[in-house]
Amino acid sequence: MATSAKESAVAELTDLFRESSAAVLTEYRGLTVTELKQLRDSIRQDATYAVAKNTLAEIAAKDAGLEGLEAHLSGPTAIAFVTGDPVNVAKALRDFAKDHEKLVLKGGYMDGQPLDEAGIKKLADLESREVLLAKFAGAMKGSMSKAAALFQAPLSKTVRTVEALRAAQGEAA
């Protein structure tokens, strides 16, 4: 690869690292072109999947201010640059790796922090952002209903007491 081509590749990878909220490094040795296309299609909505030379990826990661990825840059490496939901991408990669043993999850980073293979799998075990938001909204709605009932109880009790006093005064007169 000519020096200008390498510089261009490093610049492109650096931009991808900077624009992504997370990245997952994988080893794709032994996967067919069709299988790689299936993998790309499964994560297309939330990530870009690109094959990268290890030395160029290491330089680009350092240029982007990311440390700790060099330990995962050995063998044939492809990187999923996540621009959408990292949980969805981690799940898709984990599920694809279960079905295709030749795909190996190496590690990656999220929000600037390095992740190992176990970290990627933990990320994949999380529920999606939408599910977590729905659970949070449900908890908030329940809490608000309880708070409203709590504030209404003294008011309704006071109204019933006043009505009872009026009834008692009406009977006494």
From Swiss-Prot:
Please indicate if the UniProt record lists rRNA-binding as a keyword.
yes
What InterPro entries has UniProt attached to this entry? Ribosomal_uL10, Ribosomal_uL10-like_sf, Ribosomal_uL10_bac, Ribosomal_uL10_bac_type, Ribosomal_uL10_CS_bac
Q: Which domain of life is it from?
A: Bacteria
Q: Which Gene3D superfamilies does this UniProt record tie to the protein?
A: 3.30.70.1730, 6.10.250.290
Name a GO molecular-function annotation. large ribosomal subunit rRNA binding
Locate the transmembrane regions by residue number.
none
Q: Does the keyword Membrane apply?
A: no
Q: Which GO terms describe its cellular component?
A: large ribosomal subunit
| The entry's keywords | Ribonucleoprotein, Ribosomal protein, RNA-binding, rRNA-binding
Gene Ontology biological process terms from the UniProt entry: translation
The record's section on HAMAP family has: Ribosomal_uL10 (MF_00362)
Q: How does it assemble?
A: Part of the ribosomal stalk of the 50S ribosomal subunit. The N-terminus interacts with L11 and the large rRNA to form the base of the stalk. The C-terminus forms an elongated spine to which L12 dimers bind in a sequential fashion forming a multimeric L10(L12)X complex.
Function statement? Forms part of the ribosomal stalk, playing a central role in the interaction of the ribosome with GTP-bound translation factors.
Tell me the protein family, please. Answer: Belongs to the universal ribosomal protein uL10 family.
Q: What NCBIfam families would the database entry show?
A: PRK00099.1-1
Task: Supply the name of the protein.
Answer: Large ribosomal subunit protein uL10
Q: What's the source species for this entry?
A: Micrococcus luteus (strain ATCC 4698 / DSM 20030 / JCM 1464 / CCM 169 / CCUG 5858 / IAM 1056 / NBRC 3333 / NCIMB 9278 / NCTC 2665 / VKM Ac-2230)
Q: Which gene encodes it?
A: rplJ
